[in-house]
Amino acid sequence: FNQTVDLSSFGTYAMVAYSSLDTDFDPTNDLWQSSITNINCSPVADCAGYDDGFQLFQLADIDNPSGCEGGYSYFSNLCTDLVVGDTYDVTVTTGYGDQHVRIWIDYNDDFIFSLDEMVVSDYEIANGQGQGSYTETFQMTIPEGAVLGTHIMRIKSNWQSQVPDDACEDTTYGETEDYTVNLVTSLGFGDFELNNSELIIYSTDNK
């Protein structure tokens, strides 16, 4: 028999197959069990020894001060809407200088962060600096035509050299963090600020 299942969501899946034929005289081989675990690639890097990596990441509604979690963290609960075609400020704090940063958005949801999904190619924080606290802000543009909907966004750092093209590659010093972004065509009216605006209310026929 043929049976297809959707294993696209992260987690562990239990697989069980069982046969119960009347003419089966060997019941010892009737049951097959296995498990499949689907996780995003989690690169290894040292972000604790010298405070490399990210101590703060801010983008739109995401404001995440964090420590080192073995070089990789998936903040699946942190999500923000981003409008296709718009440019956003990204603020990052690191604990060591010479940190190169790249950002990808997995538009096709295949868990492979390819070069054409890169939205920040190479930004260096605190060039030539050593240990300390460095905060810098740079810009990220969501390209026109990007696939709408919810996707994983990966930000990755590497000390003293450009982040590898392979977003799953381990590095000696740095950190990788994954977030969730929701790409939309425009924000609702409630998302627009009306600071310093003058509102005039008209009454028509006492209604």
What are these regions (language model features)?
Residues F1-S9:
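Intrinsically disordered, low-complexity Pro/Gly/Ser/Thr-rich segments with frequent PxxP/GP/PP motifs
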Residues L7, A14-T28, K156-D165:
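Enriched for extracellular/lumenal, surface-exposed ectodomains of secreted and cell-surface proteins
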Residues S9-Y13, A146-G149:
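Short tyrosine-centred short linear motifs in exposed loops/low-complexity segments
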Residues M15, D30, S34, M153, ...:
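Extracytoplasmic/periplasmic beta-strand context in beta-sandwich domains
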Residues T23-W32, D170-E175:
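Short, exposed coil/turn segments at beta-strand boundaries within extracellular/luminal domains
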Residues D30-L31, G132-Y134, D205-K207:
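Ser/Thr- and Asn-enriched, surface-exposed coil loops between beta-strands
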Residues I39-L187:
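A broad "non-catalytic interaction surface" signal
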Residues T80-V83, L187-K207:
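Surface-exposed, proline-anchored Ser/Thr-rich loop/turn motifs
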